[in-house]
């Protein structure tokens, strides 16, 4: 049985947990990002699976999370922040999530640079994965970082601008919020522009021929499968010569949660596409 090491450290100002085979040398490296309000420990279960297969998994504390918890995020969550929108809409928190995604994706890029000199890993074989907010980060990183060679996004979606605009429209339909949202139209336009600039959706067309796995829960209302199915439909003809490198797994009777079969899917995906093992 392979011996696994677990190391908690900080690299490039990012708190991480490294889960690796004890004798790791030139292994693929997979970065894992947790969900909103979570922390790096959430990736350890998957990290063990990957390490047992011969990969190194780096579980990241997202920006403003875990060991770098930010009081600005705490204020948004506990009601003490200065909100742009009515607090009950959740729109300020939802917007901040996009900033966290971008900053964390940029952190992953810096981590790849720092791991380039680590003999345990091969930064020519980089994977990225995560769930919920971490799934958004996965899409963002895959779309914007050409060094990512394989990606697996769980219970999330790639269409950040479309979803933001849909949520704004839905919130505006409530009479009790309509006037307040209308009064900050300029701020909404600025926030929409920020999200549009980072949105991975269109850029994911250029991810081909690199492998992309998308996992959804059929009953998930936090991350509706609609947006992911739409991307899958658009990418299928692009991946026509290598259909095995694109996959959408929708789990019946599953809402916004990560299950062990999902983790198994991710492990198999990276085993196949980073290690070259069927």
Segments and roles (model prediction):
Residues 26-35:
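Short beta-strand element of the alpha/beta-hydrolase
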Residues 162-227, 232-233:
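The feature captures the conserved acid-bearing segment of alpha/beta-hydrolase catalytic domains
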Residues 1-25:
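N-terminal cap/lid segment of alpha/beta-hydrolase-fold proteins
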Residues 79-119:
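Alpha/beta-hydrolase active-site loop
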Residues 106-171:
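Primarily recognizes the serine-hydrolase "nucleophile elbow" in alpha/beta-hydrolase
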Residues 50-87:
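Conserved alpha/beta-hydrolase
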Residues 37-48, 62, 71, 226:
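The serine-hydrolase catalytic nucleophile loop
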Residues 68, 229-233, 237-278:
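C-terminal catalytic histidine-bearing segment of alpha/beta-hydrolase fold enzymes
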């Amino acid at each position: 049985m392979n011996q696994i090491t677990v190391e908690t450290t900080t690299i490039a100002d990012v708190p991480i947990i490294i889960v690796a085979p004890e004798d790791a040398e030139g292994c693929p490296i997979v970065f894992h990002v947790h969900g909103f309000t979570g922390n790096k420990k959430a990736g350890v279960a998957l990290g063990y699976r990957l390490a047992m297969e011969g990969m190194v998994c780096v579980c990241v504390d997202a920006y403003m999370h875990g060991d770098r918890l930010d009081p600005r995020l705490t204020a948004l969550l506990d009601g003490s922040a200065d909100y742009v929108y009515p607090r009950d809409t959740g729109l300020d928190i939802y917007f901040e999530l996009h900033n966290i995604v971008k900053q964390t994706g940029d952190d992953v890029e810096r981590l790849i640079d720092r791991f380039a000199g680590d003999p345990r890993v091969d930064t020519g074989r980089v994977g990225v994965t995560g769930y919920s907010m971490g799934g958004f980060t996965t899409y963002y990183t895959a779309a914007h970082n050409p060094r990512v060679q394989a990606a697996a996004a769980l219970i999330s979606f790639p269409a950040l601008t479309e979803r933001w605009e849909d949520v704004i429209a839905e919130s505006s339909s409530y009479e009790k919020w309509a006037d307040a949202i209308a009064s900050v139209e300029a701020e909404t336009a600025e926030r929409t522009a920020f999200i549009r600039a980072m949105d991975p959706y269109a850029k994911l067309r250029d991810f081909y021929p690199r492998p992309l796995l998308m996992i959804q829960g059929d009953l998930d209302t936090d991350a509706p499968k609609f947006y992911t199915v739409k991307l899958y439909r658009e990418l299928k003809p692009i991946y026509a010569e290598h259909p095995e490198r694109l996959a959408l797994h929708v789990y019946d009777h599953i809402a916004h949660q990560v299950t062990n079969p999902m983790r198994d899917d991710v492990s198999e995906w990276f085993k196949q596409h980073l290690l070259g093992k069927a």
